[in-house]
Amino acid sequence: MNLQEQILYYYKKKKYNCSETIIHAANDVYSLNLDKDSMKMLAGFGSGMYSGKTCGALIGCVAVLSKLFIKEKAHDQLSEFRKAIQLCVRNFTEDLGDTECKNIRPHSYDPNLHCLYTVQKAGMALESTIAEIKKEYELESDMIPLK
């Protein structure tokens, strides 16, 4: 399955929140090798940390990029890692207009589908970011070997 299919599965069928959906879907697609217990760390980021702040789907994307990029700590690869995160935030914002849940929900939330549209757009932003990084560094694998 591709990322969008996995997003639909985890969000609609398994009923995970936005950040949980992104990490679970990406774990399957990009073989992140995260166990179920570790992925629970993203649970509290749903609905912008349940306070309308930074979108949980975007936080999920940043978590995925962290797992793909970082060998030991961010400071060891800061210039490349910073660029990847900034690209992801840019791609996300271009599609959804903001990074704050409270500003995204009014135009993206559906009473029946909830935040599915936002999570799908976040997945697209993640995929675009990975593609841009792979192109820049002439990489073939989804795993970003800047480690």
Language model features: what each stretch is:
Residues 2, 17, 21, 36, ...:
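Conserved active-site and cofactor/substrate-binding residues in soluble primary-metabolism enzymes
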Residues 23-43, 93-99:
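Acidic-glycine-rich active-site phosphate/pyrophosphate-binding loop
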Residues 81-147:
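C-terminal binding/interaction regions
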Residues 29-40, 66-84:
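Phosphate-handling active-site elements
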Residues 24-28, 63-70, 124-128:
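Short glycine/serine- and small hydrophobic-enriched flexible loop segments
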Residues 13-16, 52-53:
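Structural motif
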